[in-house]
Each structure stands twice: as structure tokens, then as C-alpha cells.
């Protein structure tokens, strides 16, 4: 996936500034004019503008829209995830993988699970998607990781076979098999507005889309917006820019379970949480990873606002179908306040480009991340995984029957 790299822009900027001995400063004996002071700045804006426009044009030229009406837009991810197991999944591999997640068995179209589930709501969400498939599934065993973090590093001893562990999110450093998160149905981040987690993607699709109609593009505030806890300092530059340029950015930290003092919200009192629907009044919405991939990401597109996605490392099963500069604006980790300011300002000054990207992002998520697409991916995953199981599955008496 493409990503913008500001270093080259900054080099152009420094090179332009370095063409005069005085570094662009007006010396005491000179007659200072408004033109002399503004020309370098205008040139710098032009250089950055041209780079962004080129990136958008190149991305659109290479983009082939997915025309499918089912989950096939995402199936390349499934093929890639299952490729390490093309020679088959053995009982030995399952036993080695057992400590990395919750063990499930499907035998005779019945489902069994180990008694202790670390996160009951997460297990329940996973089981919701598996249950409708039971009548057509072969016998199999699954190790499903419901933790935030993936488990199977690709950097382990090269002679060691990868283990078949299913996780909702990962980076390229991991070989876990991705599944659509439990959070499409229940669970997910729990905050005061959503005490049991975001959950119910089908319902949020309707409610956020309704809010987007209340806030069409021409009525949205020309501000970048973010609310969330300080799970990493990657979010700090946007919050700091908000304090310097509140008319440009409204970004504030909220409390999380670990909050103890204003130090945990970058030396400010924590802000109130904001409903997903209320995000829609802003033109520019920022998404940051949390501990792993962000549950917020998919919801932001439904506002028909321009999504700025910080960092390309973390993935969910549907991320690969979203293309940078086509559906969202990619933002590198480590960007500073100055660079953020200029990036946001570019889209304020190129409103049509911003709206076009926002609309493409909305259409893609609305048409290709429906609840039926999530269910379809689960079905394809389970059936293809089941075909790889190369042993007779025998009932583990330590497991309890779920369905």
C-alpha cells in the first residue's frame, strides 16, 4: 500500500530556502515587501500541493474497483493467510498452537469449546458467526485468539512450522490467520457511551449513515476531528496541533481505564467521549491504531467525511481492499504538527478532491463491508480451513458443548 513520505517534501522546502544567503529573512538595510516575504511560502505550498495531487492521480490510475456483490473483494487476504498451511493442518500443529488461544472443536456439526474463555463477550461474538455454518462444516479443531495481539511471529526459527492460530488483526510480522472480529456483533472497546462495547455493526451502519445525511459535505465543519484515549504517543502531534490551531483541529484525549491524572491526557483535563454519529459534523476524521487495529476505522467512512488513517502497519481482513489516496488519506507514523497542519490545509484548499476521496471511501465500505460480507468471509474461512485439516478429529472431553 502506498503511503506519503514527507521527507522528500521537506528536502524540497529546505533546498528552496537555501537559495538565498539570508535564508529567506529580510535584512535590515533591505526594503521589505509583502511579496518578498510571501513568495517562498507560496512556492513551498505549491511543491507540497503538487506532490499530493500526483499521489492521488497515480493511485487512481492504478486502482481497479471491486465490482463484486459478495465478500470476494477480501478473499486475496484469506488466500495469503492460508498459504503457509497448504500442505495441511495436523493434530501436532494444533497441540503446539493450543496455548495461543481458545480451543474449539466442531464434530458432527456440533461445537465444543474449552471451559475457560478469557474474554466471554469476545468468544460469544466469534461463536455467533460460526454457529450458522455448523450444518455444512466438516469436523475440525480451531485455535482462536481473542486477545488484542497476534501470536505467531514470522521471525521465529525458520525451521519451525507456522502454527494455525486465528486472530482478528496482525502486522506483516505475523502469520496468524485473520478472521472478522467479534466486534462486528458484540464486544469491542467499552467506553461510557458504549459500556458493553461498540458491537452491532449492522445497527451502526444505519445510525451513522442517517447522521451523515444530516451533515452533508457542504454543511460539515472544516475541522479535523479526533476523540480517543492516549494509547500511544502517535496521537500527540494532532492533539498538540489542536491546542495551537483550534480553528483547524479539534483533537482531545479522553479517559481510559489506566487514567490517573491529567498527565495521562497530555497535561490536560480529559475530554468527554463523542458518539460515532456526532463525528459526522466534521469534514476530516482521524483514525489511529490502538493496541492493535482500530475498531473505529470502518465507522468513520460512514460519515462521508474524509478519513485520515495514521500508520499502515496494522491490518484487519478488509483493510487491503481499501486503497490509500483512493478511499482515505494515508498519514505516516511520526508526522509532526507542522506537517499535519499543511496536510489538512491542502485538503481545505482542494475541497473537491477531499469530497471525492470521502465519497469513494463511503461507497466502498457501504457496498463491500455489509454484515453479509462479514458472514460470507467467516463461511469461506471455515470451509477452506476445514479442507486443510488432515486428521480425524476426536472429542476432547475437557471441552464443553456450546451448540
Swiss-Prot record:
<keyword id="KW-0256">Endoplasmic reticulum</keyword>
<dbReference type="GO" id="GO:0005576">
    <property type="term" value="C:extracellular region"/>
</dbReference>
<dbReference type="GO" id="GO:0035251">
    <property type="term" value="F:UDP-glucosyltransferase activity"/>
</dbReference>
<dbReference type="GO" id="GO:0035252">
    <property type="term" value="F:UDP-xylosyltransferase activity"/>
</dbReference>
<feature type="site" description="Interaction with the consensus sequence C-X-S-X-[PA]-C in peptide substrates">
    <location>
        <position position="257"/>
    </location>
</feature>
<keyword id="KW-1015">Disulfide bond</keyword>
<keyword id="KW-0808">Transferase</keyword>
<dbReference type="InterPro" id="IPR006598">
    <property type="entry name" value="CAP10"/>
</dbReference>
<dbReference type="GO" id="GO:0045747">
    <property type="term" value="P:positive regulation of Notch signaling pathway"/>
</dbReference>
<feature type="disulfide bond">
    <location>
        <begin position="66"/>
        <end position="73"/>
    </location>
</feature>
<feature type="glycosylation site" description="N-linked (GlcNAc...) asparagine">
    <location>
        <position position="70"/>
    </location>
</feature>
<dbReference type="InterPro" id="IPR051091">
    <property type="entry name" value="O-Glucosyltr/Glycosyltrsf_90"/>
</dbReference>
<dbReference type="GO" id="GO:0018242">
    <property type="term" value="P:protein O-linked glycosylation via serine"/>
</dbReference>
<feature type="site" description="Interaction with the consensus sequence C-X-S-X-[PA]-C in peptide substrates">
    <location>
        <position position="230"/>
    </location>
</feature>
<comment type="pathway">
    <text>Protein modification; protein glycosylation.</text>
</comment>
<feature type="binding site">
    <location>
        <position position="235"/>
    </location>
    <ligand>
        <name>UDP-alpha-D-glucose</name>
    </ligand>
</feature>
<comment type="similarity">
    <text>Belongs to the glycosyltransferase 90 family.</text>
</comment>
<keyword id="KW-0732">Signal</keyword>
<feature type="site" description="Interaction with the consensus sequence C-X-S-X-[PA]-C in peptide substrates">
    <location>
        <position position="119"/>
    </location>
</feature>
<feature type="disulfide bond">
    <location>
        <begin position="280"/>
        <end position="303"/>
    </location>
</feature>
<dbReference type="Pfam" id="PF05686">
    <property type="entry name" value="Glyco_transf_90"/>
</dbReference>
<keyword id="KW-0325">Glycoprotein</keyword>
<feature type="active site" description="Proton donor/acceptor">
    <location>
        <position position="148"/>
    </location>
</feature>
<comment type="function">
    <text>Protein O-glucosyltransferase. Catalyzes the reaction that attaches glucose through an O-glycosidic linkage to a conserved serine residue found in the consensus sequence C-X-S-X-[PA]-C in epidermal growth factor-like repeats. Regulates Notch signaling by glucosylating Notch in the ER, glucosylation is required for the correct folding and cleavage of Notch.</text>
</comment>
<feature type="binding site">
    <location>
        <begin position="292"/>
        <end position="296"/>
    </location>
    <ligand>
        <name>UDP-alpha-D-glucose</name>
    </ligand>
</feature>
<dbReference type="GO" id="GO:0005788">
    <property type="term" value="C:endoplasmic reticulum lumen"/>
</dbReference>
<keyword id="KW-0964">Secreted</keyword>
<feature type="region of interest" description="Interaction with the consensus sequence C-X-S-X-[PA]-C in peptide substrates">
    <location>
        <begin position="190"/>
        <end position="195"/>
    </location>
</feature>
<feature type="disulfide bond">
    <location>
        <begin position="117"/>
        <end position="123"/>
    </location>
</feature>
<protein>
    <recommendedName>
        <fullName>O-glucosyltransferase rumi homolog</fullName>
        <ecNumber>2.4.1.-</ecNumber>
    </recommendedName>
</protein>
<feature type="binding site">
    <location>
        <begin position="227"/>
        <end position="231"/>
    </location>
    <ligand>
        <name>UDP-alpha-D-glucose</name>
    </ligand>
</feature>
<feature type="disulfide bond">
    <location>
        <begin position="71"/>
        <end position="376"/>
    </location>
</feature>
<feature type="glycosylation site" description="N-linked (GlcNAc...) asparagine">
    <location>
        <position position="157"/>
    </location>
</feature>
<feature type="signal peptide">
    <location>
        <begin position="1"/>
        <end position="20"/>
    </location>
</feature>
<keyword id="KW-0328">Glycosyltransferase</keyword>
<feature type="binding site">
    <location>
        <begin position="274"/>
        <end position="276"/>
    </location>
    <ligand>
        <name>UDP-alpha-D-glucose</name>
    </ligand>
</feature>
Amino acid at each position: 500500500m502506498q503511503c506519503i513520505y514527507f521527507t522528500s517534501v521537506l528536502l524540497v522546502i529546505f533546498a528552496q530556502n537555501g537559495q538565498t544567503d539570508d535564508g529567506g529573512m529580510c535584512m535590515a538595510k533591505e526594503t521589505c515587501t509583502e511579496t518578498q516575504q510571501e513568495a517562498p511560502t507560496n512556492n513551498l505550498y505549491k511543491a507540497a500541493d503538487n506532490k499530493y495531487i500526483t499521489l492521488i492521480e497515480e493511485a487512481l490510475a492504478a486502482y481497479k474497483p471491486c465490482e463484486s456483490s459478495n465478500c470476494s473483494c477480501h478473499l486475496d487476504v484469506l488466500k495469503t493467510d492460508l498459504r503457509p498451511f497448504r500442505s495441511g493442518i495436523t493434530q501436532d500443529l494444533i497441540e503446539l498452537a493450543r496455548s495461543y488461544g481458545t480451543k474449539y472443536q466442531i464434530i458432527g456439526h456440533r461445537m465444543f469449546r474449552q471451559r475457560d474463555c478469557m474474554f466471554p463477550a469476545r468468544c460469544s461474538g466469534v461463536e455467533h458467526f460460526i454457529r450458522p455454518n455448523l450444518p455444512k462444516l466438516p469436523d475440525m479443531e480451531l485455535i482462536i485468539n481473542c486477545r488484542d495481539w497476534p501470536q505467531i511471529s514470522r521471525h521465529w526459527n525458520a525451521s519451525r512450522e507456522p502454527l494455525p492460530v486465528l486472530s482478528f488483526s496482525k502486522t506483516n510480522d505475523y502469520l496468524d490467520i485473520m478472521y472478522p472480529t467479534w466486534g462486528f456483533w458484540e464486544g469491542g472497546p467499552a467506553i461510557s457511551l458504549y459500556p458493553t462495547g461498540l458491537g452491532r455493526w449492522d445497527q451502526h451502519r444505519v445510525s451513522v449513515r442517517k447522521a451523515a445525511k444530516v451533515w452533508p459535505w457542504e454543511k460539515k465543519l472544516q475541522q479535523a476531528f479526533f476523540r480517543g484515549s492516549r494509547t500511544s504517543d502517535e496521537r500527540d502531534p494532532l492533539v498538540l496541533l489542536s491546542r495551537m490551531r483550534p480553528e483547524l483541529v479539534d483533537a482531545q484525549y479522553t479517559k481510559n481505564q489506566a487514567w490517573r491524572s491529567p498527565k495521562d491526557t497530555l497535561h490536560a483535563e480529559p475530554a468527554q467521549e463523542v458518539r460515532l454519529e456526532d463525528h459526522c459534523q466534521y469534514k476530516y476524521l482521524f483514525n489511529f491504531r490502538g493496541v492493535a487495529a482500530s475498531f473505529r476505522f470502518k465507522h468513520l467512512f460512514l460519515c462521508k467525511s474524509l478519513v485520515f488513517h495514521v500508520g499502515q502497519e496494522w491490518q484487519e481482513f478488509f483493510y487491503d481492499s481499501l486503497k490509500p489516496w483512493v478511499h482515505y488519506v494515508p498519514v505516516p507514523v511520526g508526522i509532526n504538527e507542522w506537517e499535519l497542519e499543511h496536510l489538512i490545509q491542502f485538503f481545505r484548499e482542494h475541497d473537491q478532491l477531499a469530497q471525492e476521496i470521502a465519497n469513494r471511501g463511503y461507497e466502498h465500505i457501504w457496498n463491500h463491508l455489509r454484515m453479509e460480507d462479514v458472514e460470507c468471509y467467516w463461511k469461506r474461512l471455515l470451509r477452506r480451513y476445514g479442507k486443510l485439516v488432515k486428521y480425524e478429529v476426536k472429542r476432547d472431553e475437557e471441552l464443553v458443548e456450546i451448540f
